[in-house]
């Protein structure tokens, strides 16, 4: 998983890049419409593992078998580790981790329009994390040993992270996008027999785009395999529907070693009491992933943004480091001799960022589910759906959403910075309000259902209360010969009378005021008739009466 010490000494990385693709997923069972499947059934982790190609993906269980892994493991609180590691010894129902099986020299190649040579980076690892909240993260871990200039690093980050066009221009479709943001072609070469690429030409046919506008890069879809789709399948096979949580950009983690740039940004002006980085365009472009000029023209706003998104605890000293954190990036710039910091990016800081992204993705996923349940035309088993969602939400709050994950001072600061830029505390509070309102809505639906059942019972009670009263009035003796109920004509008349009283009583419950008066008179007449009927002395031997 990690480079050994000897490997680090024999290699010199100018930069290290990790692209994170957060997405939401739904397992669709064969022969069962997705709309009819509950949230728990759609997010079972075991179903996902069964669909991954075993010849390409391998389950990864974390073990403390190397000093770097040990350093990473003890960095976090014990109660947090269940959301970070897939352990065989301590299995959890939170996370499953998979590694893509790579050859000796896999490559991540970025072709840029009007540029002769592509950027060719070594793939160290491709990892897939799947979480019980119905979200996942696909990550590409890339080593750069060939490109040292800032301009090259900016282009790698900008063009390497795009998974579909940001926009389509009328008539030329992806041409303008490729000049600014989108790679002309992305290619992953695993070995001679496995090579995935995408030139995004799919989006040059608007009729085809209309059929599936949410299509993701073919590079990602080919890595995941055939069971993974971005649109509902026509067949009935088991499959997984996925969609991006963010937009056309993957999240970027980048470590970059540049002594000159780092020293320049660390210059402190005692008169102004400011660092150079606070107004530096290069630092702005590196932090906000912009390859040419800063998109912010305002000098004051640019300075404010850099102050808000820069963590400078270790600036100006030996092994100087500068951190930039935004909603789409986590950047580490340091002296080129401080290569040990790269291992921090690949371990502790990666785990921090992944956890925060999972938290954000889960919040968005829960909000989507809450909206879906609330918008159902026929509530159906609303309380059951809300109960499933609430169960997952409690699991999320207790096992994934943490306000603090380490006792290390710098780790506490960085984690707080990540939470602030992602606005997680605000979003979790808003989600809590949404789910509370949904719970109230479900309770209202449940109360209505119970009231309806109670109303039915009331009607049934009204149907039988008068016959029960009459039966009690006459006592068991009405079935004896003394009252003549052995007389079949009399018995038949009384039965009809009881049925009429019961039916009219049912109508009386739902009737309006005027009808209730009319029905009350009719029912009263029938009751009086019922009371005097046994004493009328109808003869069973009368002509036409069969004894």
Which residues fall in each region the model found?
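Short, flexible coil/linker elements and helix-boundary hinge sites characteristic
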Residues: 31, 49, 187, 266, ...
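An acidic- and aromatic-residue-enriched active-site/binding cleft used to recognize and process polar
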Residues: 143-145, 336, 401
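Membrane-associated alpha-helical segments
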Residues: 345-484
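Intrinsic-disorder/low-complexity, polar/charged segments
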Residues: 146-163, 364, 368, 375-382, ...
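N-terminal extramembrane/targeting module of integral membrane proteins
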Residues: 250-375
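N-terminal pre-transmembrane cytosolic regions of membrane proteins
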Residues: 1-277, 546
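Hydrophobic alpha-helical transmembrane segments and their immediately adjacent juxtamembrane loops
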Residues: 3, 7-12, 425-426, 430-547
């Amino acid at each position: 998983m990690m480079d050994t010490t000897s490997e680090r000494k024999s290699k010199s990385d100018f930069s290290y890049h990790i692209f994170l693709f957060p997405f939401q997923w739904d397992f669709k069972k064969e022969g069962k419409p997705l709309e009819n499947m509950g949230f728990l059934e759609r997010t079972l982790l075991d179903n996902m593992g069964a669909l991954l190609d075993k010849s390409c993906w391998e389950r990864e269980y974390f073990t403390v078998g190397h000093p770097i892994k040990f350093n990473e493991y003890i960095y976090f609180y014990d109660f947090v580790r269940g959301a970070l590691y897939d352990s065989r010894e301590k299995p959890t129902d939170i996370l499953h981790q998979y590694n893509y099986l790579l050859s000796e020299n896999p490559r991540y190649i970025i072709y840029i329009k009007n540029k002769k040579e592509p950027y060719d980076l070594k793939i160290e690892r491709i990892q897939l994390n799947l979480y019980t909240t119905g979200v996942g993260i696909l990550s590409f871990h890339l080593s750069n040993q060939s490109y040292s200039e800032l301009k090259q690093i900016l282009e790698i980050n900008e063009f390497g992270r795009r998974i579909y066009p940001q926009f389509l221009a009328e008539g030329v479709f992806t041409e303008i996008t490729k000049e600014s943001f989108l790679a002309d072609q992305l290619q992953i070469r695993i070995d001679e027999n496995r090579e995935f690429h995408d030139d995004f030409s799919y989006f040059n046919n608007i009729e085809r785009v209309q059929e599936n506008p949410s299509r993701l890069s073919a590079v990602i879809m080919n890595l995941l395999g055939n069971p993974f789709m971005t649109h509902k399948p026509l067949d009935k096979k088991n499959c997984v529907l996925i969609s991006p949580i963010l937009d056309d950009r993957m999240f970027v983690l980048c470590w970059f070693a540049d002594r000159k740039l780092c020293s320049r940004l660390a210059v402190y002006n005692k008169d102004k009491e400011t660092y150079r980085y606070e107004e530096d365009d290069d630092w702005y472009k590196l932090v906000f992933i912009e390859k040419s000029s800063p998109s912010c023209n305002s000098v004051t706003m640019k300075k404010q943004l850099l102050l808000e998104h820069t963590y400078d605890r270790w600036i100006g000293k030996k092994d100087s480091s500068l951190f930039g954190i935004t909603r789409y990036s986590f950047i580490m710039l340091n002296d080129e001799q401080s290569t040990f910091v790269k291992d921090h990016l690949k371990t502790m800081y990666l785990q921090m960022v992944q956890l925060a992204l999972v938290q954000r993705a889960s919040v968005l996923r829960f909000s989507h589910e809450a909206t879906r349940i609330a918008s159902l035309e026929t509530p159906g088993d609303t309380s059951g759906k809300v109960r499933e969602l609430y169960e997952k939400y409690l699991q999320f709050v207790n096992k994934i959403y943490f306000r603090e994950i380490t006792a290390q001072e710098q780790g506490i600061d960085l984690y707080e910075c990540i939470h602030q830029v992602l606005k997680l505390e605000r979003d979790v509070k808003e989600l809590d309000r949404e789910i509370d309102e949904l719970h109230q809505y479900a309770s209202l639906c449940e109360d209505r259902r119970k009231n309806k059942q109670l109303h039915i019972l009331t009607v049934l009670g009204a149907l039988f209360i008068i016959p029960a009263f009459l039966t009690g009035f006459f006592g068991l003796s009405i079935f004896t010969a003394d009252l003549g109920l052995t007389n079949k004509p009399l018995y038949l008349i009384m039965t009809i009378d009881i049925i009429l009283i019961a039916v009219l009583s049912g109508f009386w419950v739902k009737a309006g005021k005027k009808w209730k008066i009319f029905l009350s008179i009719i029912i009263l007449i029938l009751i009086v008739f019922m009371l005097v009927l046994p004493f009328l002395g109808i003869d069973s031997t009368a002509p036409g009466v069969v004894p």
